[in-house]
Curated annotation (Swiss-Prot):
Catalytic activity: Release of an N-terminal octapeptide as second stage of processing of some proteins imported into the mitochondrion
Enzyme class: hydrolase
Main location: mitochondrion
Entry EC number(s): 3.4.24.59
Organism: Vanderwaltozyma polyspora (strain ATCC 22028 / DSM 70294 / BCRC 21397 / CBS 2163 / NBRC 10782 / NRRL Y-8283 / UCD 57-17) (Kluyveromyces polysporus)
Keywords: Hydrolase, Metal-binding, Metalloprotease, Mitochondrion, Protease, Transit peptide, Zinc
Encoding gene, per UniProt annotation: OCT1
Protein name, as recorded: Mitochondrial intermediate peptidase
């Protein structure tokens, strides 16, 4: 999952508030300029693998972060001559970020710097000032976004609640400030003048023109041409949406009830594993089990409990959220509908889809419907076996139509009957899941990714030991991304092991975007700067990858993280985003890396999933953690086939979620604001669309993407269709082809968001007609059965 590559409104993702005081004095820190050579650990070639797999090795080389337990205290006590001691730093090597107070100071300093840039933008009307206008807008965007992105990450992953609170405060403040800028008539009209004046525009680069147009569109989406009171309403609504949205996303993991009560006599009589039952708490009287709705127990029962009544109770409870969460979603949907009305749009979807590859809600809905029509019969065919087993057990016979199948199989049936089916076929697979796990340690997969990237892109991943305080947990690995041509091109902080309090979803967080450092920039930077082979200074892209992989004890003192194949796929997916961030180097940050159209941003990550499912790639990665023996193809194949189990049902489920997203942000919402029932809309849509129908739970309140990917959730399916075309054209024959890697890199990755996505696809596929991005192009992309 990509974090906020949705740009939101002007200047990138999200917006902030502001407390500016010219009298504030703050320390300045020297630039950290890194030339071609990196500072990674220079030992044997297995360092990267060992750093993830050998805990004793990692704790030894990173012992400074394991032993540093003293509180950092106030930043002012630690500053010595405006610098920290050389072996200490703050988060992401930003020397402000050693404490929550330091984060607030960094935010305040950034606002002060931003205000100076705004003052210059408003006052400098010289020819040179107008020529540099877009560059300065981009610098303003970068200054604000480096706080916004940082705060977004800290809110999701930092273990210190005081840091999280400080991040929330800074985020909200910055959000307000950015929305003020988004509705600044002076800034907008000057930008419009720069773009429309032929003499000025002729001196701008293609990148500057593209960024200028994007920012002008953002101004216009903020109601810039409307009356001042309307613009004020826009700011208020946007800020309310941000606050409620953050509350919504922070509560998607919570269930309505912590347990389901089932009679002991009823559950004990069903032949369920006694060891599993022994782990379930009973009530005081000892007559009822209190089945938890979290952890592995409810899912184990969904696989093993023959009673449909009990399975349904468990499944619904696991997927139910609180009434308060439904109210948050309802308020979020209402506010977005009001915002779209304010801006003269028929729906929030219409507002959101401006500037996307699929240009309007009609195109999106047609794409989803076409995909559903194609997928539904195949999903029914996949469920046929489950339906027959269910009806056979009920002694009702079989020979079912598509309609009968879809009415028979409910969501709480899937795991139970799938387990029966797999148990009956398990004898065909000589290698159990546990055996395959032993070949795919996290370290093996990370080293395998590095080897793959070196083959197709000419870049590799190298370990670097972080300074004290540079990471938020000693378990975080710092990885330098090294190009064979240019040396260090970016940094990835890998927070991959499970830890209490962190986000439960795998995610790619942008911390700092790449951009060229202009010669006229003289102020010191708090981020790392590199120099490329042409002598150009550029801001290193910095990202954080977050996963929740668990470790397995292999002895009394040692543990290893083994990855299931779906987890390998997850890591490849997030690394796809990472490569986009690293290789999408542009002169301006507004269009670097993942700063591209929302319905294009998932392409690099989804394409990487194809590599993760290719046995040729997996054979180069899988090595037994003890014997170092390479995994055999015959061991992999059954598991790769298993990954395809009910794949069309999964695709249809994604399509249903995309349709729910369009429904909750569609035209009908505005006419139901006084009596909006999001749960009824969800359940009615489920009944209408069919396939594993859920008309019992209020799961829509747990659909977190309704905040981050509002009206654009279809992007996952859309980009999956594009990825299938690119895989077939470039990598299916040889996944290690450098020629294909270069073509893909040069056609897609290197552009970030600086090129029309349809032109990128047309170039990658050698189909110039796709550059139009018209109905025929969308139809071509949708004509695939390899999702």
């Amino acid at each position: 999952m990509q974090n906020k590559v949705l740009r939101g409104i002007l200047f990138k993702n999200v917006p902030l508030g502001y407390s500016y005081n010219r009298s504030i004095r703050h320390p300045t820190f020297g630039n950290s300029i890194i030339r071609w050579a990196s500072t990674q650990v220079k030992t044997s070639s297995d360092v990267l693998q060992r750093s993830f797999d050998d805990h004793l090795y990692w704790t030894e080389i990173n012992k400074q972060n394991y032993s540093s337990k003293e509180g950092w205290g106030s930043i002012t006590k630690r500053l010595k001559g405006n610098k920290l001691t050389t072996n200490r730093s703050g988060l992401f090597n930003n020397e402000y970020l050693t404490s929550p107070e330091g984060l607030k100071l960094f935010s305040q300093v950034s606002l002060e710097k931003s205000q100076k840039i705004v003052d210059k933008l408003r006052s400098d009307r010289t020819p040179e000032g107008l020529r540099l206008y877009v560059q300065n807008l981009d610098l303003l965007s970068d200054t604000l976004c480096r706080v916004i992105d940082l705060c977004e990450f800290i809110r999701s992953s930092h273990p210190d609640y005081k840091f999280v609170e400080a991040a929330q405060d800074c985020y909200e403040e910055m959000f307000e400030f950015m929305n003020m800028l988004n509705t600044d008539v002076n800034l907008c009209f000057t930008l419009k003048h720069v773009l429309e004046n032929k003499e000025i525009a002729s001196k701008l680069s293609e990148e500057e023109l593209r960024v200028g147009r994007i920012l002008l569109e953002d101004f216009e989406k903020s109601g810039i041409y409307m009356k001042p009171e309307v613009r004020e309403q826009f700011i208020t609504l946007s800020q309310s949406i941000s606050v409620i949205g953050q509350e919504f996303i922070s509560n998607t993991d919570f269930v309505k009830d912590n347990n389901v009560v089932v009679s002991c006599n009823q559950l004990d009589s069903l032949g369920i594993d006694p060891e599993l039952l022994s782990q379930i708490e009973k009530d005081i009287a000892g007559k009822n089990y209190k089945i938890p709705t979290y952890g592995y127990i409810p899912f184990a029962l969904l696989k093993s409990c023959p009673s449909e009544e009990i399975r349904e109770k468990i499944w619904v409870a696991v997927h139910n959220c609180s009434n308060e969460q439904i109210k948050r979603l309802t308020d979020l949907v209402k506010l977005r509908a009001v915002l779209s009305q304010l801006l003269g749009k028929k729906s929030y979807a219409e507002y959101q889809l401006e500037g996307k590859m699929a240009k309007n809600p009609k195109e999106v809905i047609e794409f989803i419907k076409t995909l559903m029509d194609f997928t539904k019969p195949m999903a029914a065919k996949e469920l046929d076996g489950i339906a027959e087993k269910k009806l056979t057990i009920k002694s009702n016979g079989s020979n079912l139509s598509v309609c009968d199948i879809l009415k028979t199989v409910r969501p709480w049936d899937r795991d139970y009957y799938s387990a029966i089916e797999r148990e009956q076929t398990s004898a065909k697979n000589l290698y159990g899941s546990e055996e395959v796990l032993k070949y795919f340690t996290l370290g093996n997969v990370m080293q395998g990714l590095s080897n793959l990237f070196q083959k197709i892109y000419g870049i590799k991943l190298e370990l670097d030991v972080p300074k004290i305080g540079e990471t938020w947990s000693p378990e975080v690995r710092k990885i330098n991304v090294i190009s064979e041509d240019e040396g260090l091109i970016g940094i990835i902080y890998c927070d991959l092991f499970e830890r209490s309090g962190k986000t439960s979803n795998a995610a790619h967080f942008t911390i700092c975007c790449s951009r060229d450092i202009s010669p006229y920039e003289t102020e010191d930077s708090t981020t790392q700067i590199a120099i490329d082979s042409k002598g150009t200074r550029f801001q290193l892209p910095i990202i954080s990858l977050v996963c929740n992989f668990s470790k397995t004890m292999i002895s009394e003192t040692d543990s290893v993280c083994f990855l299931h194949l779906p987890e390998v796929e997850t890591l490849f997916h997030e690394m796809g985003h990472a490569m986009h961030s690293m290789l999408g180097r542009t002169k301006l940050q507004n269009i670097s890396g993942t700063r591209c159209a929302t319905d294009f941003v998932e392409l690099p990550s989804i394409l990487m999933e194809y590599f993760a499912r290719d046995p040729r790639v997996l054979e180069t990665i899988g090595k037994h953690y003890l014997t170092k023996e390479t995994v055999k193809r015959e061991m992999l194949e059954p598991h790769l086939q298993d990954l395809k189990y009910l794949q069309h049902c999964e695709t249809y489920s994604q399509a249903k979620m995309a349709m729910l997203d369009q429904t909750l942000h569609g035209e009908t919402i505005s006419s139901h604001l006084d009596h909006l029932d999001v749960v009824k809309l969800y359940q009615d849509l489920e009944r209408q669309l069919g396939v594993l129908v859920d008309d019992k739970s209020n799961w829509c309140g747990k659909f977190g993407h309704l905040f981050g990917y509002s009206a654009v959730y279809y992007s996952y399916l859309f980009d999956r269709a594009i990825a299938s075309k690119i895989w077939g054209a470039l990598f299916e024959r040889n996944p290690f082809s450098r020629a294909s890697g270069d073509k893909y890199r040069n056609s897609v990755l290197q552009w970030g968001g600086s090129r029309d996505p349809w032109h990128c696809i047309a170039s990658a596929l050698d189909k110039p007609e796709l550059a139009k991005g018209d109905d025929e192009a969308i139809k071509y992309i949708g004509s695939t059965n390899q999702l």
